[in-house]
Amino acid sequence: MDLPRLYVPATLANLGSGFDALGVALDLYLEVEAHPAPEDAFLYEGEGHVEGTDNLIHEGYRAGMRALGLEPFPLRVRAFNPIPLARGMGSSSAALVAGVALADRLSGGRLGREGVFRVAAGLEGHPDNVAPAVYGGFVAALSDPPLAIPLPRPEGVRFVLAVPPYEVPTPLAREALPREVPLEDAIYNLARSALWPAALSSGRLEALREACRDRLHQPHRAHLMPGVLEAIEGALEAGALAAFVGGAGPTLAALARAGEEAPVIRALSAYRGPEGRTLVLGIGEGYFWKET
């Protein structure tokens, strides 16, 4: 049984103030084709180098099947991945969501989208990446209990992404965080994370300039991403509605009104560096299937 082609979006987690709680999908998609086979097989094209059946797509598929009480049968998977690896754009979450979504499809939809989120979030541990990959757009998410609520999606905006040529592994970025934070810093972030849904609901996008500010993670990780704090301020000065590090970094994301991306791109060029790249992307949809 051949399945339709599966598309799973890249994502940005944290959005500055919403550490481990807020995320957004981008219109850049991991593409996956799969069908049952005599033995597992994995064919990969795209960013980085991934091989073997011990990969995140197969891992997600096996977890999804077992969550349904089913024994996973062998699956031949072909993946094309344009999402940069270890850059803070949710490549791992996209792969895990793809695998769990394959299990859901092959079981006749027994997990449902909520079940796909629950299983994938349990594997990934970062619901702020998994939730937008499942539901699309902006999402607020919890891991315990697993819960995700989509937020209003603004029209006429684009993300400018400055993607440096180096990686920041998530475990290294986690190690940079303090185990305790001052109460005033916690309050600072709580207040600003609440501004995200308020600004998106009301259409007052100018409030995102303050909503994206953070004291809990970006300052502590800045030494892993030289010039990142200055680049965030530069993007805001150039007219960005919001600017923040994508996930654990090093990608820097700036939200701009459509047609006003050029000065933001220029402001981020030094941070990106001559060997890095700039992507301009819209807000993405949650995973979907398309007949080939």
From Swiss-Prot:
Q: What is its main location?
A: cytoplasm
Location(s), subcellular:
Cytoplasm
Enzyme class, UniProt record, top EC level:
transferase
Q: What are the record keywords, sorted?
A: Amino-acid biosynthesis, ATP-binding, Cytoplasm, Kinase, Nucleotide-binding, Threonine biosynthesis, Transferase
Its EC number(s): 2.7.1.39
The protein's GO terms of the molecular function aspect are: ATP binding; homoserine kinase activity
InterPro entries tied to this protein = GHMP_kinase_C_dom, GHMP_kinase_C_sf, GHMP_kinase_N_dom, GHMP_knse_ATP-bd_CS, Homoserine_kinase, Ribosomal_Su5_D2-typ_SF, Ribsml_uS5_D2-typ_fold_subgr
Q: Where does ATP bind?
A: P84, L85, A86, R87, G88, M89, G90, S91, S92, S93, A94
Q: Does the keyword Amino-acid biosynthesis apply?
A: yes
Key word Amino-acid biosynthesis present in the record?
A: yes
**Swiss-Prot/TrEMBL GO biological process terms:** threonine biosynthetic process
Q: In which pathway does it act?
A: Amino-acid biosynthesis; L-threonine biosynthesis; L-threonine from L-aspartate: step 4/5
Sorted alphabetically, which SUPFAM superfamilies does this protein's record hold?
GHMP Kinase, C-terminal domain, Ribosomal protein S5 domain 2-like
Record field: catalytic activity: L-homoserine + ATP = O-phospho-L-homoserine + ADP + H(+)
GO cellular component terms given for this protein? cytoplasm
Q: What does the function comment of this entry state?
A: Catalyzes the ATP-dependent phosphorylation of L-homoserine to L-homoserine phosphate.
Can you tell me which family this protein belongs to?
Belongs to the GHMP kinase family. Homoserine kinase subfamily.
Stated name of the protein: Homoserine kinase
